Amino acid sequence: TSSKYGGVTPRMIDLAAPFDEAHYNQPQNIGYCMGVNSEAITEANAEKTAQEFERFIKDPHCLGIKLYPGYNAVYVNDKRHWPLFELARAYNVPVAIHTGDTAWPSGLLKYSHPLTVDEAAVAFPDVTFVIAHCGCPWFADAAEVACKNANVCIDLSGLVEGNPKPLMLLERQRGFLRQLHTWLNYLGDYEKIMYGSDWPLVNIPLYIWMISHVVPECYHEDVFYNNAVRIYSKIGKLLEKCGG
């Protein structure tokens, strides 16, 4: 999309026609988060970038903001992000943050470690931050940041990729999944934990099956549905609109 105010525009999904301010041109059953190209934001254009994002955040399908530290060599609490955090607070939408491993070797893990979320969470206590991928493989650190900060939640997307057979998956990833289970129990608050897929990198039915074996059954309804509807607060109206 083209810039209207001279700032950096969001990275958008490409499932529909180009963005239009009147109709937004999004499929009726799709919600999305605006992607942030942090390296393109400067002190000079940070406020203008927030204005660009505000155009999109008014879209009923826009559920939040997504940062990509690690892929961008910018820490979560860098001041260039602050106007976006203020925008998230004003519109009551969460800020999701890529954490943990990166998909290619050029990514820099010091920026994507889940401990980096702590500083932003303390500086902006009225903004909800979502640690995407549970900080994989740093589950302990992600759980501690979420445990310490009332405004931090976790999603379980993209932990295992591909399409292995279920029993092979459990056998191959037994220790990995045991650690995940241990640290989710350490957090102890399953209202802070959300299912996520990272589609198309995962087989959705298999991934649901895997997460259902990690999360105690009594919390399935919260982890697979209720928490996302509460944390991404615009989902409810979107579901009503779609008849869901």
Segments the model singles out, each with a brief description of its role:
Residues 34, 72, 157-159, 221-229:
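A generic structural motif
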Residues 62-64, 77-194, 242:
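Catalytic pocket-lining loop regions of alpha/beta-barrel enzymes
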Residues 13, 20, 54, 118-119, ...:
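Active-site phosphate/pyrophosphate- and oxyanion-stabilizing loops and adjacent acidic/basic residues
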Residues 3-4, 39-41, 72, 101-105, ...:
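Active-site environment of divalent metal-dependent phosphoester hydrolases
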Residues 46-55, 168-171, 235-240:
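Short, surface-exposed amphipathic charged segments that create phosphate/polyanion-binding patches used
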Residues 19-25, 145, 183-187, 215:
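Short, conserved catalytic or adaptor-binding loops enriched in Gly and charged residues
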Residues 1, 181-182, 186-194, 201-244:
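Mid-to-C-terminal alpha-helical segments outside catalytic/metal-binding sites
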Residues 6-111:
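Active-site gating/metal-coordination segments in enzymes
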